[in-house]
Amino acid sequence: MRVIVFFDLPVITPENRHNYSVFRKYLIKSGFIMQQKSVYSKLVLNLTNRDSIVKSIEKNKPPEGLVEVLTVTEKQYAKMEIIIGESKTEYLNTDERLVVL
């Protein structure tokens, strides 16, 4: 299961930019991987884990802007189609439960 976070935050004032930076660093520190500029994803094992992550995001949300969370299964995530560009291979993109490295 994957938790995908989409956000659109204002960056007009220095305070806005600071809030953006703090939120982005929080996501990275929490184990999220950048998919696109404002789209981050994280692998979760179950719904309980997902719920705790969402609560943590709510606790660390910036004061302004839009933050959305979408949860998809690994099978759904693996079926994502790339229309243009290349997928980063820094992480595995599979729905297999056992991965041998």
Swiss-Prot record:
Transmembrane segments: none
Enzyme Commission number(s): 3.1.-.-
Residues involved in Mg(2+) binding: 8
First-level EC class: hydrolase
Keywords: Antiviral defense, Endonuclease, Hydrolase, Magnesium, Metal-binding, Nuclease
Gene Ontology annotations of biological process type: defense response to virus; maintenance of CRISPR repeat elements
Alphabetical list of HAMAP family matching this protein: Cas2
Family, similarity comment: Belongs to the CRISPR-associated endoribonuclease Cas2 protein family.
Job description of the protein: CRISPR (clustered regularly interspaced short palindromic repeat), is an adaptive immune system that provides protection against mobile genetic elements (viruses, transposable elements and conjugative plasmids). CRISPR clusters contain sequences complementary to antecedent mobile elements and target invading nucleic acids. CRISPR clusters are transcribed and processed into CRISPR RNA (crRNA). Functions as a ssRNA-specific endoribonuclease. Involved in the integration of spacer DNA into the CRISPR cassette.
Name of the protein this chain belongs to: CRISPR-associated endoribonuclease Cas2
Organism: Treponema denticola (strain ATCC 35405 / DSM 14222 / CIP 103919 / JCM 8153 / KCTC 15104)
